Regions:
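Conserved hydrophobic/aromatic "anchor" residues
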Residues: 73, 93, 129-130, 135
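Conserved catalytic-core motifs of GNAT/GCN5-like acyltransferases
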Residues: 119-121, 131, 136-152
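Conserved N-terminal entry element of GNAT/NAT acetyltransferase domains
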Residues: 1-19, 159-165
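Conserved acetyl-CoA-binding loop-helix of GNAT-fold acetyltransferases
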Residues: 95-108
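Conserved GNAT acetyl-CoA-binding A-motif
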Residues: 110-123
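Acetyl-CoA-dependent GNAT
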Residues: 18-86, 90-92, 103-104, 124
Length: 165
């Protein structure tokens, strides 16, 4: 299969486990590196960012694989305010259509969790992707580690019930 055509691929999604916490951090840092952040900034995030075992156990955290090769992960937090807390693809998987497939899976997971809408605090470089998917910008959130404002988005799942008149 040609990996330049993500829409023709079948991805695998497996539950992350506590043994994957370092891997999650590394994927996030490598993904951020794609967007041109300085090595100093990436190292600062690497030293400050930790995924706790409890986070992985309590939330829906899925590793994304293409032909058994890790290409990213996502995390959904169900709570008083439901969130797509993370969606990161490794640089080799960016721009190949995988994001569209992953976002479909995220919506499926949300339906299973009875989530009808969720919020996303987006990296500015990913905001356009979420807007194309139908998310709406509802504000901004200050990020202390990044010392800047990040877009706050809201995505509402489409109902599976269609009324024909």
């Amino acid at each position: 299969m040609n990996s330049d055509f993500g829409e023709n691929k079948v991805l695998q999604f497996i539950d992350a486990e506590s043994k994957h916490t370092g891997l999650l951090r590394d994927v996030l840092i490598l993904s951020k590196g794609y967007w041109g952040y300085s090595q100093e900034q990436l190292e600062q995030w690497r030293s400050n960012l930790k995924f706790e075992d409890e986070y992985v156990a309590r939330n829906t955290v899925k590793l994304i694989l293409d032909e058994s090769e890790l290409i990213g992960f996502f995390a959904i937090v169900k709570g008083d305010i439901d969130e797509l807390d993370h969606l990161w693809l490794l640089p080799k998987a960016i721009g190949k259509g995988f994001g569209n497939l992953v976002f479909e899976k995220i919506q499926s997971e949300c339906k299973i969790l009875n989530i009808t809408e969720f919020y996303i605090t987006s990296d500015p470089d990913a905001e356009g992707f979420y807007l194309k998917k139908g998310a709406l910008k509802v504000g901004e959130v200050y990020s202390e580690p990044q010392k800047r404002m990040l877009p706050k988005l809201k995505f509402t799942l489409k109902s599976t019930i269609e009324i024909h008149t």
